Amino acid sequence: MFEKTTWIKLPRNVLVGHGVLDDLGEAVGELYLTGRPLIVTSPTPNDIAGDRVRAQFDDPATAVVEEASFEAVEKLTETAEAVDPGYLIALGGGKPIDIAKMAADHLGVGFVSVPTVASHDGIVSGRSSIPEGDTRHSVAADPPLAVVADTTLIADAPWRLTTAGCADIISNYTAVKDWRLARRLRNVEYSEYAGALSEMTAELLVENADMIRPGLEESAWVVVKALVSSGVAMSIAGSSRPASGAEHLISHQLDRSAPGRALHGHQVGVASIMTEYLHSGENGEWSAIRDALAALDAPTTAAELGLDDAELIAALTSAHEIRDRYTILQGGINEAAAIEVATATGVIDG
């Protein structure tokens, strides 16, 4: 007897484009949420867009977060309990969005994502990434009820944040390969739909990397839509698998050993060059990934991540210890093999 079930939670409204920040009130109104909103933001996005958001709501409250941490989630939850909001609005980058996502989950209320940068797919997904000491935790939470992404704001954001978002998406290519490998060798549940959507999104950015340029709303449009697709793929899968494989394990290890050196998206981008080499060999697609990252002005080497060769190799050889997730690195890779991979792909000079 067939007894399989799935529960896919997706945003109800996704609004992307020129000047759509001024349509936030209408987009939220269509959700029929009640009560006052609590706007969760950080200093820079609050200065840039906070007043425009507050002007669209009656009696909004605002909480400004300074860091991403479990303590920040707890503090925001306490603030929200005092304010008694009907819902949260997360305005900014990964920091306020991840914090608001977790706080909303604790409070049992919905939240709306209003990204001002396109640095990673957390703007849409049902996952929060929270650092704790030398470890970064990926925590499940409900995805936003709506996403309102104004390409005017995002095009004006620092270019390195946008290239990090692009690199994060491009790394989906190898994440899906790891997922398929886990299905074949460990019978891990696999979603053809989610896998295909994630892979198609990565391929779209690889093929159009030379058309994505700083300051262009058209480029911001492409990147944000790709981030939305990646987040939707994770929601369909009910897992981060469509966007997180061995390349993310390497990045998490770098977060432990070399915290703050590089952006998350840039780390997984460089890592995906090497994991693709492990999947398909010297004639595989790793060079296409590297060339796409280079076309975006994203890092392609350890040095460009602010790492020396030894730090990169140490992360590559120990990444499999991060979590019990079957990937191409299962069982680990020894130092000699890691040096060969990193050298062959140009990630280190050798």
Curated annotation (Swiss-Prot):
Binds 1 zinc ion per subunit. CDD domains: Gro1PDH. It is found in: Cytoplasm. Pathway: Membrane lipid metabolism; glycerophospholipid metabolism. It catalyses: sn-glycerol 1-phosphate + NAD(+) = dihydroxyacetone phosphate + NADH + H(+); sn-glycerol 1-phosphate + NADP(+) = dihydroxyacetone phosphate + NADPH + H(+). It is an enzyme of class 1 (oxidoreductase). It comes from the Archaea. Its cofactor is Zn(2+). SUPFAM superfamilies: Dehydroquinate synthase-like. Keywords: Cytoplasm, Lipid biosynthesis, Lipid metabolism, Metal-binding, NAD, NADP, Oxidoreductase, Phospholipid biosynthesis, Phospholipid metabolism, Zinc. NAD(+) binds at residues 94-98, 116-119, 125. This is Glycerol-1-phosphate dehydrogenase [NAD(P)+]. The gene is egsA.
